[in-house]
Amino acid sequence: MKVRTKGLLFDMDGVLISSLGSVERSWQTWAESKGLDARETIKTAHGMRAFETVRKLMPDGDHAAELKVVEDLEMEDIADLQVLEGVVSILQLLPQKYWTIVTSATERLARRRLAVAGIPLPARIITADMVANGKPHPEPYRRGAEILGLATEDCLVIEDSTSGAKAGHAAGCKVLATTFSHSIDQLEAADWIVESLGKVKITILHEDQGLVLEFTSLK
């Protein structure tokens, strides 16, 4: 299958990098300190902004203070952070005008993880603390398209979560999902599904005509 687009909007965790170990350990530590169910806390946190997770699980708590506790735990825990398959070769190929990152992490945490991973950082990215509404709301991906100077229908979102795929569609983008964290059935909001970016070939077209992605969709 070949898909043509003018810009790529990458989610971060589960698409470019895996910080799953850090995320789960940090939320488990926080949950246990608050007497919350760790498994349910981790499930709630995936694909949702940390602030929203804290607010949902502790509606009467000091949300800003609790967010800082979780973020500090995640900032310190980077031992097993990994760059995912296919990411390095794709980002080495792409000039930065063609892509940016749209993540549910805060800017502080996103920049920390990307630096540790050695991933080149676009001049501007969209993070949790830059939007009023997190995924699955369309705002994050609308803002990402604005960074690239493109209409949302000219952008392809690359996601690994249900909420992220829904956000991309709600923004008016097509969505390519990877199966890093969710099953094919859970990613029904995506237009196409691949195992990882290692299964995707990208060609840059001449004269600023955009990009062509080639892959075999699992959907």
Where are the model-predicted features located?
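Phosphate- and divalent-cation-binding pockets in alpha/beta enzyme and binding domains
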Residues: 26, 53, 86, 109-112, ...
